[in-house]
Amino acid sequence: ELCCPMERSS
């Protein structure tokens, strides 16, 4: 899981 919503493209 990534920290921030902006980090995840999908």
Swiss-Prot record:
Family named by the database record: Belongs to the snaclec family.
MF (Gene Ontology): toxin activity
Tissues in which the UniProt entry reports expression: Expressed by the venom gland.
GO cellular component, one term: extracellular region
Main location: secreted
Additional remark text: Negative results: does not bind to GPIb and alpha-2 integrin. Does not agglutinate the formalin-fixed platelets, even at high concentrations.
UniProt-recorded name of the protein: Snaclec trowaglerix subunit beta
Subcellular location(s) of the protein: Secreted
Function: Potently induces platelet aggregation of washed human platelet and platelet-rich plasma in a concentration-dependent manner. It acts by binding to GPVI (GP6), leading to kinases-dependent exposure of functional alpha-IIb/beta-3 and platelet aggregation, and also induces metalloproteinase-dependent GP6 shedding from platelets.
Keywords noted in UniProt: Disulfide bond, Hemostasis impairing toxin, Platelet aggregation activating toxin, Secreted, Toxin
Subunit structure: Hexamer of heterodimers of subunits alpha and beta (alphabeta)(6); disulfide-linked.
